[in-house]
Regions:
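Carbohydrate-active catalytic/glycan-binding domains of CAZyme proteins
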Residues: 1-154
Length: 154
C-alpha cells in the first residue's frame, strides 16, 4: 500500500482512494502507475460511499478477498474521548469502483453499510480501521477510547 497527499493505493493496480471528505463521501479514481497521482484533468471520480445529509463518513480502507472488494469506512464522530460515537461499517463489490452493497442489500452510496464494530461497555468510538493479512488469517486493527481510563485513546 502506498499513501500520501490524500491518496491511498490499494489492491487493484492503478486505482486508489482519493479526495475523500468527512462530509462529501468517499471517491476512487485511476492513478498514474508511475507517479501515483490521479490520472486525467480533472480525474474521473467514482463515488463509492456517502451518507444522506452530509453525515460524517471517513477513513476508507479497501481489501480484496477472493472475487470481492470490501470497503470499510467509519461513520459519525471521532476524537471526542468517551463522547465519540465513531463506528465501522463495510460493504462489498465485485468492482473496485462499486457499487458496494451491505448485507441487507443497501448501497453504500446511499448510506448503507453493515456494522462491523461500534462502542460497547467501556469501548468508545472504535474506528479508522485497517485489515491486515498474515498467512491465511485476517486481522482487524482500529483505535478506540478506553472508558476505564477516562477516555484515553488506544
Amino acid at each position: 500500500m502506498k499513501s500520501g497527499a490524500g491518496v491511498a493505493e490499494i489492491y487493484e493496480p492503478n486505482f486508489g482512494i482519493t479526495r475523500f471528505s468527512c462530509f462529501s463521501g468517499i471517491k476512487v479514481c485511476r492513478l498514474d502507475g508511475r507517479t501515483g497521482k490521479p490520472m486525467g484533468t480533472p480525474p474521473r471520480l467514482h463515488t463509492v460511499a456517502a451518507r444522506p445529509g452530509g453525515a460524517p463518513i471517513e477513513a476508507p480502507f479497501v481489501v480484496r478477498h477472493n472475487d470481492f472488494f470490501y470497503l470499510f469506512v467509519s461513520f459519525d464522530h471521532c476524537c471526542k474521548g468517551v463522547k465519540s460515537d465513531y463506528k465501522v461499517v463495510v460493504g462489498r463489490s465485485r468492482n473496485i469502483t462499486g457499487p458496494y452493497i451491505d448485507i441487507a442489500g443497501r448501497d453504500m452510496r446511499q448510506g448503507g453499510g453493515t456494522l462491523v464494530i461500534a462502542g460497547h461497555d467501556d469501548v468508545f468510538g472504535p474506528g479508522h480501521n485497517s485489515v491486515l493479512k498474515d498467512s491465511d488469517r485476517y486481522w482487524f486493527a482500529h483505535h478506540f477510547y478506553d472508558g476505564e481510563r477516562n477516555g484515553v485513546a488506544t
